[in-house]
């Protein structure tokens, strides 16, 4: 049975979709863009955008009663793969700071993302 997850600690969906769905042991998190929940603003640089996206994913993970260690897959969409070294730096620090191993990951360059952001990530978690 699907259980919809919504939290005020992550941006509201900008379209007709849920922040996340829990189904038995799986948690599927919709693509998150770097909207700061408190201010509603989107920073300009890729490092801040990456950090906010990961922070938003963490908020959904916590609201779902999962942990960062439960994340098994992340898909990164970016408008500029030449900035992957910056994304990787923030990404690596996030998982180390949360005492987690690195989940599997794919990185895909796209022409454009919603609200003209530079990065979006979706995630999947599994918990026994």
Curated annotation (Swiss-Prot):
One of its GO terms (molecular function) is deaminase activity. Gene3D superfamilies: RutC-like. GO terms for cellular component: cytosol. Pfam families: Ribonuc_L-PSP. InterPro entries: RidA, RutC-like_sf, YjgF/YER057c/UK114. Belongs to the RutC family. This is RutC family protein BUsg_359. It comes from Buchnera aphidicola subsp. Schizaphis graminum (strain Sg).
